Every structure is written in structure tokens, then in C-alpha cells.
């Protein structure tokens, strides 16, 4: 490269470049690529100014040879190539005589005709990228930027190229020649890559064929190819003025950055409409369990055996009747379905050997409830593609629903402690290393805080139901199988307990795709009278099935017992996630662990024990209309767990959208609280994106109302 520079450039340029490098403590013999780049840049600056003069009338003219006596003044003052002190002297004198604003960085030229400084760039990369980097660095509206590349591309501020076509062509030809010369000596690759500091061996994932054509078609405006866009993105410097960047990206974009102040955000608008209804796959706070302690009956652990045993603990059966019909359904069919379950359970018991599974008779009421033969017949596309008015069904927009108080009660209930433990302490071997000791100590404390939590019961109940339903869906596709809803726990005294919540009857389940739906009817015991909050139960038909004797202060009193029956559906992918709801536990453990780590690093010792045992300390749990709620570490664990579990139980596209979009607003508000002076553009569009997700989902509506409480307190 050194030889190449010596042979290709004017000795004066080579000398100036050597001087410039030494001024910055760099060695031209070692940093040969940089040496060549500086020479090239100097030569372009000189060529830019060559032959350009201003005549006595102040017009710009080009004189290549001619009368040496003509009264001509050089159009450009060359600043590049002078030593720093001299260069700044020239800049200062120009500013003093012309009144032009003094630049922060040394420019390359001054144009006496346009009265502006010029920054010349020569790049081996994309001109866009280099232009942006220059613009970001100098951050001055007044300095004109003109970038040339070795491939003949150029870019200048406001597409004002200063010079005539021919002068620019001369520069481009010279750059192209330098590139050819370097390439012929095998120097070009190293030179090209050195600007970017990338590896010489370049491995790229090649995109070809259709994908390549699609990629080229889908580029933003002003990009000719995918490479060109890739390079632009790779070189994008994150700091700097957003407006400028946006206006360079596209002529159509003009973003006004608005300051985000305490008065800027408004609360989210929650929808009006009838109150929202319960949409979980099984009852939560309203569930009633029929339980057996220390089960030791024959076939213990086989769901059907366990269920029959649990049913026997209830003595208050009555003739069932409908007390809250389903608005749209054929309610007598739900009643008949329950009677059929009772009758078929009786049949099972009467058999000599109880079977492990029970398939229900395909009665008219079950066929109706499970939507048998209701699906429209599928026709091969080939047979109907010529139909002229082929179209998809019109589907109705979902009806907006308002937030109802029951979902907050459900959440509060999920945070509470029950009197049973729902997860076992893992059987883990002896600790070997000190870190393992800390880890198992944390896990034990954590387990103690959450093992009795109602949210943990919901996890185990969900895992059981989804596993059983997925199994049955694969093993008995055509059968209406009866699936008991069971969970297991330990009492305070450590006794094992098996609980029955009710039954599921599954419909036909030929599930080819992840999203194919299996319909099921759920029948769940409850002591909740549905007439207290009828809107919560609009999807259910509720029967009264008996009376349960409950201990009260004055002895035992009968309480009416209800059965919530509804048709529901799920899919393989939903059951897969339902089976993995236990993942909420490690997810939460990580959150708690980062809190402990933060404490420990402040105190410079492990704070696990103090963290869990210091009962006087309170932690922020969340924001309510009353302000920031605080509680013990156990309460924090249980609240975070309940949130995580509800995200799983009430998973929906509305929740996905709300979480993603509201997070952006949350980050902006946090930045404001941290005095980072955030700015936004199109805040209205962000609000629209958030509010588009607030339709009818109870959990999303509750989160939105919490978000509003947070906004109120955060901006006080």
C-alpha cells in the first residue's frame, strides 16, 4: 500500500498526509489504509477547488488555462491539509469577514460564492451512512456536506451539489481509477473494509431467488438494493437529532418532536357497554371442591375412581333445576347433560370392574352442547374456485364491554393464602457449593411464600385439566370422554388431599393443526349464587343441584350448591401452554431474586435471610386509586405470581397488544419521572394502538384501569 500511495499521489499530497498523521500520533508505515484514505481525501478537496474562480462581476467561472493576468479570485478556500493552528486562523478570519457562524469542527473548504463551509467526505461504504455520520458529528445546519463514494455515488445536503456535472465527474473518475488500481494490486478489499473495521473474511447469509426479489421490493424509499439498505442500517449511529434522520430517510416523513411533560398524558379511555363477563376456561374464586383426605381407596390416582370417591362425600343432592339460563342456548339440554353424567357415573359404579375411562353416550343433548355436525361441510377449493361471489363470512365486530368489579375481586382472591400447600418442595440433593446453598435457601423461602397461594392452586388445576384434556383429545378422538377436574394438595398437617371441581365432557377432537378447536362442556361445582352478578355468568347456564351443610357460628347451615355449565373450546397450542403454566413460578423467582441481588449488592453481603424474615419492611406492590400499595415480601411474591398466572389464564390477542403498546407509554412516563426530558412524536397514534386493544377482555380492562392509576400517581 505504501508503494501504491507513493506512485499514485502527488508528492505534495503525500507529504501533507504524513504530516497530518504524525500530528495525531499515527504512523503512515503501519496504518497504511488510513494513509491512503487521507491522501484520497486531500486530492478530492484539491480537485473540488481546482479551476473554479470568481470573476470581477462576482460570477463563478471555470478556467482551465488562459490569461494569467485576468482579475480572478479562487472560489474555494482550502482549509484541509493545513496544520490545525493555521487552519483555525483561516476559519476565524473567514467568519470575521463574512459573518458566517463559526463551525465546531474544522471543515475542508469555504465556498466564497455560496458563502458556506463545506465538509467533503470520501467513503468506501454507502453514501447515506457516511452522510448521516458526518451530519451527526457536525450537527450544524450551516456547514454543507458533500459525500463521494468509490462506486460513483454521491450525496449532498439538500441535493445541492455545488459544482457542475463535469467537475464532479472528474472527481468520480479519479476515485474509480484509484479503486481499480488498488484492486489490481489486491489492496482494495482490505482498504474497503478498514473503514468499517470489519473482518476481512466476510461471511454473509445469501438471499436469492424469490426472497431476494421480495426483499428488494420491500425496501424503504431511496434504497436501490438490500445490500445498500443493510449497510445503511449497520452504520446507523443511534445518538443525534431524530428529526434530521427521519427527514433523510424519507421525504414524506416530517416528525415534530413534542416535549412530554407531566400535563401531556391523558388517561386511557376504557370502553362503555354492558359489564364484561368471565371467560376463563375454569372457575377461579367461585370454584367449590369435593375433597377426600388421605385417599387410600382401590385405584387411587385413577381420575375416574378418585372422582367417584369425591362425589360420595356430598350428601345433599337434589333434583337439579335451572336458576340462571344461558341467554342464547337450549338450556334444558344443559340440564339433561348433567343428569346424564350422574346416571352414567352410577352405571360405572354398578359394573363389576370400574373402567379407567368413561365415554359418554352420544345423546342429542350432548351432540347439541358439543356442536356435533354443526360445522359447515368443507369443500375442496378446486371445486369452488370458479364461484364468482366466493367470500368469507362477515363476522361481527366484538361488542365493547365495560370494566366490572368482579375481575379485581378475582385478582385479590388469587393473591390470598389458602390453608393447603399446592406445590411440593423439590427433592434436591445435598448442596455442594456455597452458591448452591444460597440458591436452595432462596428457593425454600420462596416456595414457603407461594406454595399456599391461591394462584398456585390455579396453576396446578390448569396444568391438570389441560394435560387430561390434551391426552383425551389425542387418545379418544371420536369419543365424548368424561374427564374429572381434579387437583391434589397437602393440608396444614401434611395430609394428602384429592379434590374434585367438576367434570369436562370433550367433543370430537381430530386436531391436525395447532389451532384446531376441540369443544368441551364444563360442569363445575360452586356456592356462588349467579344472580348476584348475572353479567359475570352470561356464558354459563347455572343449575341448582343440592345443599351443602357448612359450619357457621351457630352450627351447621345448608347452603344451596350450584353447577356452572358451559360450552367452551380450546386448541392444542392453548393446551400446551396451559400445561406449562408452572413456568410462572421460575419467572417470578427470577424477579424476586433480582430484588434480593439489588439489596445484597448495596449491603455487600447476601441478604436472602433478612429479605424474607424482616417482617417490618414493606415493598411496593402496585398502584391503586388510593396510591402506592405496599406489603410484606410474601405479599409481593403472591401479587406478582397472581399477575403472571392471570396472564396465562386470560391470554388473548388483546392482552398481547395492550402489553406491547402500553409498555411504550410506560417507558416514556418512567423517563419523565427520571427527569430524562423525553420527547415523542405521534403520541396520539400510540394511544390509538393501546386503546384498540381495550374491547371486552376483563383482564385487559383491569390492567388498563391499573395503568390509569399509575399515570395519576406517577405524574403528581
Curated annotation (Swiss-Prot):
Subcellular location: Host cytoplasm; Host nucleus
Biological processes, Gene Ontology terms: cap snatching; DNA-templated transcription; symbiont-mediated suppression of host gene expression; symbiont-mediated suppression of host mRNA transcription via inhibition of RNA polymerase II activity; viral RNA genome replication; viral translational frameshifting
Residues engaged in binding Mn(2+) 1: 41, 108, 119-120
EC number: 3.1.-.-
Residues where Mn(2+) 2 binds: 80, 108
Cofactor comment: Binds 2 manganese ions per subunit.
Example of a GO MF term: RNA binding
PTM characteristics: Phosphorylated on serines and threonines by host kinases, including human casein kinase II.
HAMAP family (UniProt xref): INFV_PA (MF_04063)
Record's protein name: Polymerase acidic protein
Gene source species: Influenza A virus (strain A/Mallard/New York/6750/1978 H2N2)
Lineage per the UniProt record: Viruses, Riboviria, Orthornavirae, Negarnaviricota, Polyploviricotina
Amino acid at each position: 500500500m505504501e508503494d501504491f500511495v507513493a506512485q499514485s499521489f502527488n508528492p505534495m499530497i503525500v507529504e501533507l498526509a504524513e504530516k497530518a498523521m504524525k500530528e495525531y500520533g499515527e504512523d503512515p508505515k503501519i496504518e497504511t489504509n488510513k494513509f491512503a484514505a487521507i491522501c484520497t481525501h486531500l486530492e478530492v478537496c484539491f480537485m473540488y477547488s481546482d479551476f473554479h474562480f470568481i470573476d470581477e462581476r462576482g460570477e463563478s467561472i471555470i478556467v482551465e488555462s488562459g490569461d494569467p493576468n485576468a482579475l480572478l479570485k479562487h472560489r474555494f478556500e482550502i482549509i484541509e491539509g493545513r496544520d490545525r493552528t493555521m487552519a483555525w486562523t483561516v476559519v476565524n478570519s473567514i467568519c470575521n469577514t463574512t459573518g458566517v457562524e463559526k463551525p465546531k469542527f474544522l471543515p475542508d473548504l469555504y465556498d466564497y460564492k455560496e458563502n458556506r463551509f463545506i465538509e467533503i467526505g470520501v467513503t468506501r461504504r454507502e453514501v447515506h451512512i457516511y452522510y448521516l455520520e458526518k451530519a451527526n458529528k457536525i450537527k450544524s445546519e450551516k456547514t454543507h456536506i458533500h459525500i463521494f463514494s468509490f462506486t460513483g455515488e454521491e450525496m449532498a445536503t439538500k441535493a445541492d451539489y455545488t459544482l457542475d456535472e463535469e467537475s464532479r465527474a472528474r472527481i468520480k473518475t479519479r476515485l474509480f481509477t484509484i479503486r481499480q488500481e488498488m484492486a489490481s494490486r489486491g489492496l482494495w478489499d482490505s482498504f474497503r473494509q478498514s473503514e468499517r473495521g470489519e473482518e476481512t473474511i466476510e461471511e454473509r447469509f445469501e438471499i436469492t431467488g424469490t426472497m431476494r426479489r421480495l426483499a428488494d421490493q420491500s425496501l424503504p424509499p431511496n434504497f436501490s438494493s438490500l445490500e445498500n439498505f443493510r449497510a445503511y442500517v449497520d452504520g446507523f449511529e443511534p445518538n443525534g437529532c431524530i428529526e434530521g434522520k427521519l427527514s433523510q430517510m424519507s421525504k414524506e416523513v416530517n416528525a415534530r418532536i413534542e416535549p412530554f411533560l407531566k400535563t401531556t398524558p391523558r388517561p386511557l379511555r376504557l370502553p362503555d357497554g354492558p359489564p364484561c363477563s368471565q371467560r376463563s376456561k375454569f372457575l377461579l374464586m367461585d370454584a367449590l371442591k369435593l375433597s377426600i383426605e388421605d385417599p387410600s381407596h382401590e385405584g387411587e390416582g385413577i381420575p375416574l375412581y378418585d372422582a367417584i370417591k369425591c362425589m360420595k362425600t356430598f350428601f345433599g343432592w337434589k333434583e337439579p333445576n335451572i336458576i340462571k339460563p344461558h341467554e342464547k342456548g337450549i338450556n334444558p339440554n344443559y340440564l339433561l347433560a348433567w343428569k346424564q353424567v350422574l346416571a352414567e357415573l352410577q352405571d360405572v359404579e354398578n359394573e363389576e370392574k370400574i373402567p379407567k375411562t368413561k365415554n359418554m353416550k352420544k345423546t342429542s343433548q350432548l351432540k347439541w352442547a358439543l356442536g356435533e355436525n354443526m360445522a359447515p361441510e368443507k369443500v375442496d377449493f378446486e371445486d369452488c374456485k370458479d364461484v364468482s361471489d366466493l367470500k368469507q363470512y362477515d363476522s361481527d365486530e366484538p361488542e365493547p364491554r365495560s370494566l366490572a368489579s368482579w375481575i379485581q375481586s378475582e385478582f385479590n382472591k388469587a393473591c390470598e393464602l389458602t390453608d393447603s400447600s399446592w406445590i411440593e418442595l423439590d427433592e434436591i440433593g445435598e448442596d455442594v457449593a456455597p452458591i448452591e446453598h444460597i440458591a436452595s435457601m432462596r428457593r425454600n423461602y420462596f416456595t414457603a411464600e407461594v406454595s399456599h397461594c391461591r394462584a398456585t392452586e390455579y396453576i396446578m388445576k390448569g396444568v391438570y385439566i389441560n394435560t387430561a384434556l390434551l391426552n383425551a383429545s389425542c387418545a379418544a378422538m371420536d369419543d365424548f370422554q368424561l374427564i374429572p377436574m381434579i387437583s391434589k394438595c397437602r393440608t396444614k398437617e401434611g395430609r394428602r388431599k384429592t379434590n374434585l371441581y367438576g367434570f369436562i365432557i370433550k367433543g370430537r377432537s381430530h386436531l391436525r393443526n395447532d389451532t384446531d378447536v376441540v369443544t368441551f362442556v364444563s360442569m363445575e361445582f360452586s356456592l356462588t349464587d349467579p344472580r348476584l352478578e348475572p353479567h359475570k355468568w352470561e356464558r354459563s347456564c347455572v343449575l341448582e343441584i343440592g345443599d351443602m351443610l357448612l359450619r357457621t357460628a351457630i352450627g351447621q347451615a345448608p347452603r344451596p350448591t350450584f353447577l356452572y355449565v358451559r360450552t367452551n373450546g380450546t386448541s392444542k397450542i392453548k393446551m400446551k401452554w396451559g400445561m406449562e403454566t408452572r413456568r410462572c413460578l421460575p419467572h417470578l423467582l427470577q424477579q424476586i431474586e433480582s430484588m434480593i441481588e439489588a439489596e445484597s449488592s448495596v449491603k455487600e453481603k447476601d441478604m436472602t435471610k433478612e429479605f424474607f424474615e424482616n417482617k417490618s419492611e414493606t415493598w411496593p406492590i402496585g398502584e391503586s386509586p388510593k396510591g402506592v400499595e405496599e406489603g410484606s415480601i410474601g405479599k409481593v411474591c403472591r401479587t406478582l405470581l397472581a399477575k403472571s398466572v392471570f396472564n396465562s389464564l386470560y391470554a388473548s390477542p388483546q392482552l398481547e397488544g395492550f402489553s406491547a403498546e402500553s409498555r411504550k407509554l410506560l417507558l416514556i412516563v418512567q423517563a419523565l419521572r427520571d427527569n430524562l426530558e423525553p420527547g415523542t412524536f405521534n403520541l396520539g397514534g400510540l394511544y390509538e394502538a393501546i386503546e384498540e386493544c381495550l374491547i371486552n377482555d376483563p383482564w385487559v380492562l383491569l390492567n388498563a384501569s391499573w395503568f390509569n392509576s399509575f399515570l395519576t400517581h406517577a405524574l403528581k
